[in-house]
Amino acid sequence: MCSSDLGTKLEQCSTAPLTGFFRNGCCDTGPQDQGLHTVCALMTAEFLALSKYLGNDLSTPRPEYGFAGLKPGDKWCLCATRFLQAHEEGAAPNVRLNATHTKTLSVVPLEILQLYAAD
């Protein structure tokens, strides 16, 4: 069973678009998830622009991968390091703590996540 930052059952992040390292709608993780895709974030135009600038274009559709592209308001499981970087750049999106995995805390302090809590 997964658990969230709050020590409760990990809630689903999004199924439309389908997110998560395992594409199961959940920001859970495992040994094969080197990027730690554990932060359930609500996309903003500012974050999407920063991510594209940093080389990870999440907004452009990639039909060959079945990826429609993200838009503001979509929920997506972000890499913990990218979230922390966005925080440092002043462009971090809001997060759903109940859908964010506890492994995130190995990279991002809870106090920082709480600054962006949407739930």
Cite the ranges covered by each PLM segment:
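Short, basic/aromatic beta-hairpin or loop at an interaction surface
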Residues: 42-57
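Active-site microenvironments that recognize anionic phosphate/pyrophosphate groups
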Residues: 5-34
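Short, compositionally biased
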Residues: 83-106
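Short, small-residue-biased leader/transition segments that mark boundaries at the very start
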Residues: 1-3
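Glycine- and charge-enriched low-complexity intrinsically disordered segments
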Residues: 101-119
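Short alpha-helix capping/helix-loop boundary micro-motifs
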Residues: 59-66
